[in-house]
Design a protein with these regions (language model features):
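Non-catalytic cap/lid and distal C-terminal segments of serine-dependent acyl enzymes
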Residues: 1-345
Length: 345
């Protein structure tokens, strides 16, 4: 017996689930699993038109997210998976939508290759993209492939096309990490104070405590988890040593390490990757006006960086909406639908 809404909903398209065995993630420094879930959504009509090919939109998650988060319903709203299916069921231009898992034991990977976390950029670009193109009827070129995400996923949605314009021709970033001195630096004193008062200045002591109390958070956890995870992605030495960008005793910046972080800021990357950005067919940028990490300011800075390198205004959709950092899943269907339309043949 099928359950009625909200517990069950009839799908117009289909969701295909895979367990992907990644060679790139095998032997990663955190010993995280190299077998990862992968969801591929095919839109209504996919099975009825066996020769038709579709643009694809890749959806990547924020910090601490795993791919099954897209199944989560709220009391008065469907899941993201269901919302996107409903969007295409309404007759909007169709696309294949791919949901990627790039979680790590530190919470995330920023979708980069790093000796601190593993080769998540390679995994996404050089393993998953060819796999999906081989097994589904995508339009297998950058002009018809986009990527979307929120927060750290929004960061990945910005930097992945910058690094691989041969693979991605469009992006949608919702409150993506950008303008690092605004979104990250305010947490450095908080993290330093928490380390001093609770862990004798030791991140190792924090991690031991954090992992010993699953589901029992402390107020200081978010800043400590976030900054250490980011350091693992942005400023890990080749031997695996994670370098923090601030002094754990004072919270003051360590300039040479901080410069390594800034080199990964999408706002700053724009000037050296101008050709890649000018080649994108569609760029969606949004954020809530009350974002707790000031990513509305980062969104504006990224928009201005695009303009400064000559990205055509008609390729960019920019919006600041009433909202904060959380609870903005309602932005996904329209943004993914916009990419699907812009990336269609």
């Amino acid at each position: 017996m099928d359950l009625p809404p909200p517990w069950g909903r009839a799908w117009a398209g289909r969701l295909h689930e895979h367990a992907f065995d990644s060679q790139a993630l095998t032997g990663n420094p955190l010993s995280d699993s190299h077998v990862r879930p992968l969801y591929v959504y095919t839109p209504p009509g996919y099975d009825d038109e066996p020769h038709r090919r579709y643009p694809s939109v890749w959806v990547i998650q924020g910090m601490t997210g795993q791919v099954d988060m897209w199944r989560n319903r709220k009391a008065f709203s469907p899941s993201v998976l269901e919302s996107i299916d409903a969007w295409f069921a309404d007759g909007h231009p169709p696309a294949i939508v791919v949901y990627v898992d790039a979680w790590t034991s530190y919470g995330g990977s920023q979708f980069l290759d790093s000796p601190g976390t593993g080769r998540y950029h390679t995994y996404l670009c050089d393993e998953l993209v060819p796999f999906v193109d081989e097994h589904y009827r995508t339009l297998p070129d950058a002009a018809h492939r986009g990527i979307a995400g929120k927060s750290s996923g929004g960061y990945g949605a910005m930097v992945t096309p910058i690094l691989r314009p041969d693979l991605f021709g469009g992006l949608a970033t919702h409150a993506g990490d950008a303008l690092f001195e605004i979104c990250y630096q305010p947490e450095f004193p908080q993290a330093a104070r928490a380390l001093r008062d609770e862990y004798d200045g030791s991140f190792d002591a924090f991690w031991a405590d954090f992992r010993a109390r699953p589901g029992r958070p402390k107020r200081s956890d978010p800043a400590l988890v976030n900054e250490y995870a980011m350091a693992a992605c942005y400023s890990t030495d080749a031997d695996g040593t994670i370098r923090l960008p601030f002094d754990v005793g004072t919270g003051q910046l360590i300039p040479d390490v901080w410069d390594r972080w800034l080199a990964w800021d999408p706002v700053r990357m724009a000037s050296s990757r101008a050709d890649a950005l000018r080649g994108l067919r569609a760029i969606w940028i949004d954020a809530g006006r009350s974002d707790e990490y000031f990513l509305d300011l980062g969104a504006e800075a990224f928009r201005r960086a695009l303009a400064s390198v000559g990205v055509d205004d008609d390729r960019v959709r920019f919006e600041l909406f009433d909202g904060a950092h959380g609870g903005i899943e309602w932005r996904y269907p329209e943004a993914i639908g916009w990419l699907a339309e812009r990336l269609a043949p």
